A protein has these predicted regions:
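Non-catalytic propeptide/linker segments at domain boundaries
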Residues: 1-42, 56, 60, 91-92, ...
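Alpha-helical scaffolding within the catalytic cores
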Residues: 97-107, 205-215, 233-245
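Metal-dependent polysaccharide deacetylase catalytic core of the NodB/CE4 family, i.e.
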Residues: 34-36, 68-183, 204-205, 260-264
Length: 381
C-alpha cells in the first residue's frame, strides 16, 4: 500500500514532484537453458510435438511476436545445466546438444536487442545447508563451500565466453527461485566483475532463504543494486495488476518475470494451455500499457544505469506566484520525473519537456523530462 500512501500525500499537496526510472522490464528466468528432451503430456495434448520442438518453434516464436507487437525487450537469465553438481570436482562438460540450445537461444535474444544475465551454473540457489531451508522438498542441494560456489560461477563465465565471446558482459543476476543469502552475494561480487544488479522479488515473505528486496544500493555490497521484480507469470491476475501499479506509484518502473516451464507447471500455469496463457500474458502487458503508456521498454542493465543516475539526486522546490522553481543537487544526466499539480495546470517549462498523463478533478499529473539543474514551471488556470 506504499504506492497508495505516496499518491495520497501527493494529492494533499499543492504540488508534488518525484523522480522515476520510467522503465518497463521483462525478464525470462531460465533462458537460455537446456531444453527438456522427449515428450510432455501438456505440450503433446495440444501441439503433438516434442518438448524441444515446441519451445524452439512455437513458444519462442510466440514470445518474439508478442514482443514485437507490444515493444517488449527481453532480458534472459542463463542456466548452464540442470544438474546437482554443487561440489567443485563434480562439474563435468555439458553436452553438445545443450551447447547448441544455449547458443541458438542466446544469439536470438541478442538479435532481438535483449540482454543476457545470469541465473546460475545450475538451478541450486547459492545457499549453504540451513535448517530453515527445506532443500529436499524443493529438489535442491546446498553448496558445500565458497570454493564450490566460486567454481560454479566460473563455469558460467567460461561457457558464456565460449558461446558468445569476450565482449558479452554479465551485468544482472537473478537468484534461482529468488533464494539468496550473504554467502552467495559475496561470491557473486567477487567472481562476476561486471555485475551491477541483483533482481529478486519485492513482494513476499523473507523466510526459507527467499531474498526479498527493497529498491536501492545494497548496503553490505555497495557495488551492486537491488532492483526487484514486482510481478510474474503468464496468467492474468487482478492482485498482480494491483501490485504492479502500487509499486510503480513509489518507484516508477515495472519489472515482470516468467519461466519457459511455467506453462507445463500445474500451479504456475493454473492448468491453462499455452494458447490461453499467451493471450493472458499479452493482456497483462496491454493493461499496464493502457494505464502507463509512457513507460520505456529496456534491458535490465539500462534501468540500472538510470537508477545510478538519480540515486544521489536531491530535489528542492518552491512556489512563487504562478511559478514553481525546482533546484537539483547532484544532478548528473537528464531524467524523468512525475509532478502532481492541484488546481492549476502547466503552461510551459523553462527547459526540458512535459506531458499531461492523468487528470482527476482539479488534480493533474505530468511526466517531466528534466535536462538541467534548475528549471522553472510556469502555471496557469
Amino acid at each position: 500500500a506504499r504506492g497508495l500512501m505516496n499518491q495520497w500525500i501527493a494529492y494533499g499537496s499543492e504540488w508534488y514532484i518525484t523522480p522515476i526510472l520510467n522503465a518497463r522490464l521483462m525478464h525470462i528466468d531460465d533462458f537460455p537453458a537446456p531444453i527438456p528432451r522427449g515428450a510432455n503430456s501438456v505440450i503433446d495434448n495440444h501441439y503433438h510435438v516434442g518438448t524441444r520442438d515446441f519451445y524452439r518453434q512455437i513458444w519462442w516464436k510466440d514470445m518474439l511476436e508478442i514482443g514485437s507487437r507490444r515493444k517488449i525487450i527481453y532480458s534472459g537469465f542463463i542456466i548452464i545445466d540442470y544438474n546437482h553438481a554443487v561440489r567443485k570436482g563434480l562439474m563435468n562438460r555439458i553436452s553438445d546438444l545443450t551447447l547448441k540450445d544455449l547458443s541458438l537461444n542466446g544469439r536470438e535474444l541478442f538479435l532481438d536487442e535483449g540482454e543476457l544475465g545470469v541465473h546460475g551454473y545450475n538451478h541450486n540457489p547459492l545457499l549453504y545447508d540451513s535448517k530453515d531451508v527445506d532443500f529436499a522438498s524443493l529438489n535442491y542441494k546446498p553448496w558445500g563451500t565458497q570454493e564450490d560456489m566460486a567454481a560454479g560461477i566460473e563455469q558460467v563465465n567460461k561457457y558464456v565466453e565460449e558461446l558468445f565471446g569476450k565482449n558479452v558482459k554479465l551485468y544482472t543476476y537473478v537468484p534461482p527461485s529468488n533464494m539468496l543469502r550473504k554467502e552467495g552475494l559475496e561470491m557473486l561480487v567477487k567472481h562476476y566483475p561486471d555485475l551491477k544488479a541483483v533482481s529478486s522479488i519485492f513482494y513476499g515473505t523473507d523466510s526459507g532463504g527467499v531474498y526479498i528486496q527493497e529498491v536501492g544500493r545494497n548496503k553490505e555490497f555497495p557495488s551492486i543494486y537491488n532492483l526487484p521484480r514486482f510481478s510474474s507469470g503468464f496468467y492474468y491476475d487482478e492482485d498482480e495488476i494491483w501490485g504492479i501499479f502500487n509499486a510503480f506509484a513509489v518507484y516508477g518502473y515495472w519489472s515482470h518475470f516468467m519461466h519457459p516451464d511455467d506453462l507445463i507447471s500445474k500451479d504456475r500455469s493454473r492448468n491453462k494451455s499455452w494458447v490461453e496463457l499467451k493471450d493472458e500474458f499479452e493482456k497483462v502487458v496491454v493493461t499496464v500499457e493502457e494505464k502507463l503508456p509512457f513507460l520505456e521498454p529496456m534491458r535490465a542493465v539500462d534501468m540500472t544505469k538510470r537508477y545510478i543516475n538519480i540515486e544521489d539526486l536531491k530535489i528542492t522546490s518552491e512556489k512563487k506566484g504562478n511559478d514553481i522553481h525546482i533546484a537539483l543537487t547532484d544532478f548528473r544526466e537528464p531524467f524523468k520525473a512525475l509532478i502532481r499539480i492541484n488546481s492549476k495546470k502547466i503552461k510551459n517549462i523553462s527547459s526540458g519537456s512535459f506531458k499531461e498523463i492523468y487528470t482527476a478533478g482539479n488534480s493533474k499529473i505530468y511526466l517531466l523530462s528534466i535536462e538541467k539543474e534548475d528549471i522553472t514551471i510556469h502555471l496557469g488556470d
